[in-house]
């Protein structure tokens, strides 16, 4: 009986520990500004000497000024993470501005390390995400100025501007100093080196010629 109780306790502690490690680690001091030049390799960045820290380590100028030029898929992502603001190190948050051309989109992608909460600043967006296997349930919504939508961590999601005449702008907050992004089309058809067309033809149940054509396209590196 004692052995069973000990095993149960150990299991619960292990689960609690795993949950604690499932997000960015909590800071153990007021701040830990990332030392981008440190040779020390850690999960994140080593701390800059607090005596060398100044206000600019917590600052980034002009995120909401002029509209950004959009790319081939009709969007432009301006990411502010620990690489742009070293003071974000250990704080578990980052932010992005997304500009959408008329009929532009931020294509299906995932953030492996972060939940995202999106707020529409201008225009209208059609957004959605898909749950994991086996259900693959699709949740979608049309958002207008001021509306907010959440994309759970790790799930495939997208945003699309359905207006053929007007652009749209949104701000996204993400629950990691470095959320990462995997744009699905880029990863599958634009990997370097390419995934075997035998593998992809079987996976998508199409001819290898179709896969070869897809892999030959220019895949836009548009993600955050």
UniProtKB/Swiss-Prot annotation:
Q: What is its main location?
A: secreted
Q: Which GO terms describe its molecular function?
A: manganese ion binding
Give start and end of each Cupin type-1 domain: 62-212
Q: Which residues bind Mn(2+)?
A: 109, 111, 116, 157
* Glycosylation sites (chain numbering): 76
According to its UniProt record, where is this protein located? Secreted, Extracellular space, Apoplast
What's a single GO CC term here?
apoplast
Q: Which family does it belong to?
A: Belongs to the germin family.
Question: What is the role of this chain?
Answer: Plays a role in broad-spectrum disease resistance. Probably has no oxalate oxidase activity even if the active site is conserved.
Q: Other notes on this protein?
A: Member of the 12 germin-like protein gene cluster located on chromosome 8 in the major-effect quantitative trait loci (QTL) for fungal blast resistance. Partial suppression of the 12 germin-like protein genes increases susceptibility to the fungal pathogens causing rice blast and sheath blight diseases.
Q: Quaternary state and partners of this protein?
A: Oligomer (believed to be a pentamer but probably hexamer).
The record ties this protein, via PANTHER family, to: GERMIN-LIKE PROTEIN SUBFAMILY 3 MEMBER 3 (PTHR31238)
What name has this protein been given in UniProt? Answer: Germin-like protein 8-11
